[in-house]
Amino acid sequence: SKAKEFFINNIEIKEKLENDFNKENLINKGFQEAFTELITKLVQSKNLNEVKSDNLNQIKSMIETFTIEEEKFINKTYNLRIGVSFNKKKIFEYLSSKNVFPSEIKEEDFLFFPILLDQANNDILIYSNNSFYDNWNSVEDKNFLVNYILPTEDLEDLNLIRKNYSEIENYNFENIIKKYSLQNSIVAIFFKDEKEIKVLSKINIKNKKVIKSNSFNNINLQDEGELKKIIYDLKMIYEDFWKEQDIINTSI
């Protein structure tokens, strides 16, 4: 990424056309949104609160240019879409002053293979009745860098995994993964009992293998809100792991 600027576009802001309407204030609001979007993509979630800023002058000092991509009036509301370009060196200096290391902003495809072990019923669910398979891609955030490809239903794979139910934690999924020709994959095994869900994530990034373990208590998968929160939290864990692979040494 040799470019000297970070460009954030499609920032949409709107405001009612009242007597105190001020276009400049609206553009300033857009600058703040663009800055928040940029740093959310650049840093791991644990550092986000340290580097968020409401200081408009500080944000403006890091902006090179901005463009108005679209403006329109609908129902007495002024709608604005802007693109903002930030000076990369100044952004890096700002993060460095907070002792935070940015990562490359790199979008990437991952095969995501969710396996739900219903321990109460001694059942293994992959495609049907697996709420993680059904809902995984319905939880989105425009700042996510990882794009998930879910497996297509495959009876052969299902039988293979069922056959290895008892040692699923140690099972090597390579035969299944290689069918998809993707460099990166996550096999997530969800161990579900009455009150808790443990998640064992077998992550493979460019031949680097890592296992992560997380647990969620008092979860009801029938509750859409709770289910989506687990999915969002797991996606954040995977986002952070992806960012860890590409930390930029800004001192060079």
Please provide the spans of the model-predicted regions.
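Short N-terminal segments immediately surrounding and downstream of signal-peptide cleavage
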Residues: S1-E18
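Edge/loop elements at the starts and ends of beta-strands within beta-rich repeat scaffolds
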Residues: K2-F6, E24, K72-N79, S103-E108, ...
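Amphipathic beta-strand/beta-sheet edge segments enriched in Tyr/Trp
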Residues: E5-N10, G83, N87-K90, I177-G225
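Non-catalytic, solvent-exposed interaction/assembly segments
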Residues: I8-N10, D20, E33-V43, L48-S53, ...
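C-terminal/domain-edge helix-coil "capping" segments
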Residues: E24-K41, G83-K106, D141-L145, I176, ...
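N-terminal segment of the mature soluble domain
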Residues: N25-E50, F113-S166
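Signal peptide-directed extracytoplasmic domains
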Residues: N49-P114, L125-N129
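A short, hydrophobic beta-strand-centered structural micro-motif
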Residues: K60-E70, F113-P114, N147-E153, R162-K198
